[in-house]
């Protein structure tokens, strides 16, 4: 079988914290939403689908959420459950961009070709100032299920990178 390459994610940059006293949370019929009355949350240089955002200074929703879909520049849905909470106009809730996840991609096992060696490569780029240095962990995950649920995924051993910016290119075989 010919070698192929799949790019799961292009370049990502850190989004500066977004704060506002108009940020609210709603839970309606299994749809979990974070929105504001005027503070821009999404769009160029802001949050996007699959970003991880950590909420602080809210009454009931201080947690990390995965952006599921962008509804508008002032509203997005999340994967995780939120507790309905209205903005009080004086408490400034902060949304901190803490990372991102990528879409899932089908591997050769899905196509009944469970042989061969796989390589994952990470390129960590420091753009020159301390506000964008990557300092964290990247994990490759896999599943043996042909129609996986969230619980079917596992970390692939030997492919986890914890970066301190001393080396910027990493490759792992599995």
Residues of each region from the PLM?
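Predominantly extracellular/luminal regions of secreted and cell-surface proteins
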Residues: 2-6
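A short beta-strand element within beta-rich, extracytoplasmic domains
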Residues: 53, 114-132
């Amino acid at each position: 079988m010919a070698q192929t390459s799949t790019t799961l994610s292009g370049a990502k940059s850190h989004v500066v914290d977004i704060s506002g006293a108009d940020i609210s949370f709603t839970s309606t019929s299994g749809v979990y939403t974070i929105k504001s009355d005027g503070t821009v949350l999404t769009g160029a240089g802001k949050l996007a689908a699959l970003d991880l955002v950590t909420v602080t200074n809210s009454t009931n929703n201080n947690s990390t959420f995965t952006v599921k879909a962008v509804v508008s520049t002032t509203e997005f849905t999340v994967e995780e459950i939120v507790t309905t909470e209205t903005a009080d106009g004086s408490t400034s809730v902060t949304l901190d961009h803490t990372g991102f996840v990528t879409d899932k991609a089908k591997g050769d096992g899905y196509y009944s070709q469970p042989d061969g060696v796989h390589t994952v490569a990470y390129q960590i780029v420091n753009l020159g100032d301390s506000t964008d240095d990557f300092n964290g962990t990247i994990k490759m995950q896999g599943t043996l299920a042909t129609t996986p649920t969230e619980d079917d995924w596992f970390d692939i051993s030997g492919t986890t990178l914890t970066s301190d910016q001393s080396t910027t290119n990493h490759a792992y075989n599995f």
